[in-house]
Amino acid sequence: MPSRTITRLVRLYGGTPLVELPPIFLAPALQFPSLHFASFQCLKFSTTPAPGLKLDLSKHRGVSAIHRTGPRYPLSVSKYPLPRPVKPKEQEKRPSNPKHGLWGFFGPDRKPIPTPEEEYAHGRAWSIQELRQKSWDDLHKLYWLCVKERNRIATARYERQRLQAGYGDYESNNRDKTVRGTQQSIKQVLRERWYAWEDARQLYESGEYSPADAQVMEAEAYAYEPPALDVEEPKGEASDSVKTPPSS
C-alpha cells in the first residue's frame, strides 16, 4: 500500500525526483481520505438517539381464531377459573319493579304496541295564548311530559318496524306531530319571556327605568278598580248563566 501511494504521487507531479519524496514511514499519512471510511463515531457527544427495541403497536399480534393461538402475554383472567353458565330453568327469577323508570317508555297498560284507536285518541296541541298564563314550573313539567310521550311513541314505532306489524304508522305520526307542536309553542313562550327580560335589563342599565317608577305603577295598579258590568236581563225571564257582579 505505501509503494502504490508513492507511485501515484510520482505520476501526479510529473516524475518528481526521489530526493524530494517524503520518507517511507510517512507513506500512510499521504493516503487519500476518500479511499477509507470511518466505521466508528468520531465525536464523543451526539444528539442522535441510540437505536432501541421497537415496540409492537398491535396488541393482537399472533392471535388467530383459525389456528387457535392465544395472546402472547398471559392475562389476568387466566389466573381464575371461568364461571360456568347456568341453565335457564335453574336461574332464579328476579322480581320486577313496577315503578322502574324504563316503564315510562310504554303506555299505562305497558303494551309494546298500542292499537291504532289508542294512538288516535288524543287532543290538540297547546296554544301559545294558553301557555303564556303558565308559570315556569308548569312549562318545565309540560315540556318533559312531551319528551316522555315522544319516547313512548318512538318505542312503539321501533317495535312495529321490528315485528313488521303493518299498522299504526299514520296514527303514531299524527300523535307525534301534535306533541311536537306543543313543544314548539313552549319554546316560543320562553323566547318571548327572554326578550322581555332582556329589554327590561337594557332599560334599567340605560337609566330610563328605575325602581321608583315601578313603585308608582304598582300603587296605581292597586288603586284601579274596574267598573261593574251592566247586563240588562230580559223582562219576565231570569238568566242564570249571566250574573251581575256586585257594585263596589
Curated annotation (Swiss-Prot):
UniProt keyword terms in alphabetical order: Mitochondrion, Ribonucleoprotein, Ribosomal protein, Transit peptide
Subcellular location: Mitochondrion
Keyword Heme among UniProt keywords: no
Pfam families registered for this protein in UniProt: MRP-L47
Residue segments, region Disordered: 77-107, 223-248
Gene Ontology CC annotations of this record: mitochondrial large ribosomal subunit
Predominant subcellular localization, coarse grouping: mitochondrion
Gene Ontology BP, a term: mitochondrial translation
Gene Ontology molecular function terms on file: structural constituent of ribosome
Family stated for the protein in its record: Belongs to the universal ribosomal protein uL29 family.
Assembly: Component of the mitochondrial large ribosomal subunit. Mature mitochondrial ribosomes consist of a small (37S) and a large (54S) subunit. The 37S subunit contains at least 33 different proteins and 1 molecule of RNA (15S). The 54S subunit contains at least 45 different proteins and 1 molecule of RNA (21S).
PANTHER family: LARGE RIBOSOMAL SUBUNIT PROTEIN UL29M (PTHR21183:SF18), RIBOSOMAL PROTEIN L47, MITOCHONDRIAL-RELATED (PTHR21183)
Protein name: Large ribosomal subunit protein uL29m
Annotated source species: Ajellomyces capsulatus (strain NAm1 / WU24)
